[in-house]
Amino acid sequence: MLGLRSLYIILFCCVFTAQAQHVFKGTVVDALSSVSIPNAHVKLNDSYGVVSDENGRFELSGLPSGTYLLEVSCVGFKGFKKQINLTKKVLYFDVVLQPDILELSQVDVLGQNERLTNITRLRSIEGTAIYASKKNEVILMESTLANKATNNSRQVYAKVPGLNIWESDGMGLQLEIGARGLSPHRTSNFNTRQNGYDISADALGYPESYYTPPSEAIQKIEIVRGAASLQYGTQFGGLLNFRLKKGENKPLEIIVRQTLGSFKLQNIFVSLGGSKGKWNYYSFYQKKSRNGWRPNSNSEAQTAFSSVQYQANDRLEFGLEITHMDYLAQQPGGLDDATFLSNPDTSFRARNWFRVNWNIAAFTVDYKFNERTKLNSRTFGLWSSRDGLGVLDRIDWSESGQQRDLLLAEFNNFGNETRLIRRYLIGESESVFLGGVRWYRGFTVKEQGLADSGSNANFSFENKLDHYGSYFEFPSLNKAVFVENLVRVNDCISITPGFRYDQILTEFDGFFHAVVNDSLYYTNNRKKLERGIFLAGLGVSYKCFLGGEAYANFSQNYRAINFNDMQVINSNIVIDPDLEDEKGFNIDLGLRGMAWGVLEYDLSVFYLNYSNRIGYLSDYYDSVSAPEPDDIYTSYRLSTNIGDSKTLGVESYVSWNVLKSFTDIETQALNIFLNTSFQKGTYVRSDEPSILGNRVEYNPDVNLKFGLQYQYKSFTSSLLYSYTSSQFADAQNTISPTQNALFGEIPSYSVVDWSAKYDKEKFLIEVGVNNLLDRSYFTRRATGYPGPGIIPSDKRNYYLCLQLKI
């Protein structure tokens, strides 16, 4: 009996000891900004409790197994309750708190000053994605002071280091940003997405973005640099993802915004959204028009969006989204250098038009197997077109009333991306596995020929088969598998290896014909490229660095030949028939965090290696190569693999909460921020002697933005100074401009913008002045639309916005 009793006691002690070893830990974060929340009270069954630390982390140990009621509360946030089942040794759980917005009529208190610092970072794990050790930025649009009616990129992206911005139109119809010496052309060096799915014309063959969501509808913009290539696609620039707003936690909320501005700018934006039961919905409609500050630059656009989410149960959620955008823009064409210096508001093209019709649909499924395992599947399609009409001859040649060139393009794409994320334990440290697959099918049709000789927006061919013209089909197919694994070595160090394998098919099939010396020539072209691409990456993060984080990342990149690189008819451009795909890698090394609760920083160095870089060489037609006799001895751009480049740079963002450093005043705040980028891009290999050792084009040495932001109760004001040093427009580093303005230096420029708003409960007023000092400058030399030639940026302009929330 004694032996049996002793055995019972031993077994009981073992069970009790096992029960006492359970640990419950996690992080408390803000649902709106993804910022960690300190001082949150975490309780289990009113028996166990703890307060989250300065990084939002909490841990409860010595817990017996069983079912618990988890309750989390924090001042300024809505309470959180959830039943959890504690059976495993260590249970990780992230708590997401919704802000508790109170409408105060008598007292105005700013509370936390994050509203001024509208930049934050992605958490290591967001939904079914891993961002640990990756350089990234998140722009919170609700706190961004900018001319949102025109999507003013200079203001919206003011706190993102190193971005080179093209300003091609004054109404924000197309976003054009680049980084680290990558061309800003329609943001084609980023993988551009909306709510996680593709929105560009063709993700591989034609990654240009003709659609940009209205700033008024965006909740936040997520930017992940080149290390995003493993999860989101192979682009050197990384990921640019627009997260649109969702319905508030109320049955119905209506927002109406009316904006008026210089050059007859008119913008109306209406949104409605809400939640009821298991349903959440959000819709908006925007219509805007503008005459432009140069002649022949009228434009009008409209955008509509609707989304609905259905939470079937605690595990399963469905979502459906539909987007439509269309616009018609008259384009005044480019200028040569002499005209820009003397009369930048001149236009030599009165018959150029551009038309876009963009349609996107997406269906999403989110399924939670348990607290550790989640699945996300996105199925999306795009049915869109873009058409260009006008005279694309050299800008230094005057118009003679000839027939206009017409370029039509249709894009029909369909794809699915499914990813699974799984949290697991290595010892007592939680690690995270992410695996995903992608299937993407694209089909693009491009036609080019002659239209009428009129001046209206008549997008119809005339005698297409009797004169010159072309018709090409561009099918593309992409199958990919990707894996990343976040391994936490301990509470401080994590390592994230990963890889991606893509099967890529791009091809074209079609013909073009032209009249040469009164004879009609037909040429059939067909080309097919099929290849497999393997990319690898590795990231390391150290989070016990004085309240901050040290991070490092290496990731390979790849860029497939663009459809435009395969075939184009443009007297300004000639395509090398032996083009090859581009490849390379990004390296980031940096420090980021918050010091003393008032100084936010992200300091990093990067290295970009770019092989087989496609660019332009300057050349001249001779009697054999000239497409027309009049073209002999005129210059053109040859698109070819010009060589290998490397870019090394320093990117930094620092924001100082001045008043919080010296006082405890809660009714006002003053922030100063400095965003700088110093970089040097050089061609280190080239078969062209005129290229080797040259600077990379569209890669300014210095890119700086300095801002002041002041807030007093409901009033906020912001002053922004932007400076970009001189840069080259071609790889041959042409300084003296050519007559057609395609080649030459882009001089340095500086711009000042001022914005202010008064936000009082349901009523809001926004005012501002862009290009406050009325500088005359330009950011690009265009080879085709909207040029060719120099595209002058807007002169000083004003805006006023009134908003009503119901």
Language-model features and meaning:
Residues V23, E253, L260-S289, R294-Q330, ...:
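Transmembrane beta-barrel wall of Gram-negative outer-membrane proteins
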Residues L328-N343, F443-L450, L505-N517, K528, ...:
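Surface-exposed extracellular loop regions of Gram-negative outer-membrane beta-barrel proteins
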Residues Y197-R225:
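Short acidic/polar hinge/loop motifs at secondary-structure boundaries
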Residues L420, D491, V605-N609, P629-N733, ...:
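Gram-negative outer-membrane beta-barrel transporters
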Residues S611, S618, L659, L670-I672, ...:
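C-terminal beta-signal and adjacent terminal beta-strands/loops
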Residues D314-M325, V356-H513, K543, D602, ...:
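Face-selective signature of the C-terminal outer-membrane beta-barrel domain
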Residues N313, S429-L434, R438-Y440, F472-N609, ...:
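Structural signature of Gram-negative outer-membrane beta-barrels, strongest in the C-terminal barrel
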Residues V270, W279, T364-G390, S541-K543, ...:
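Membrane-embedded beta-barrel scaffold of Gram-negative outer-membrane proteins
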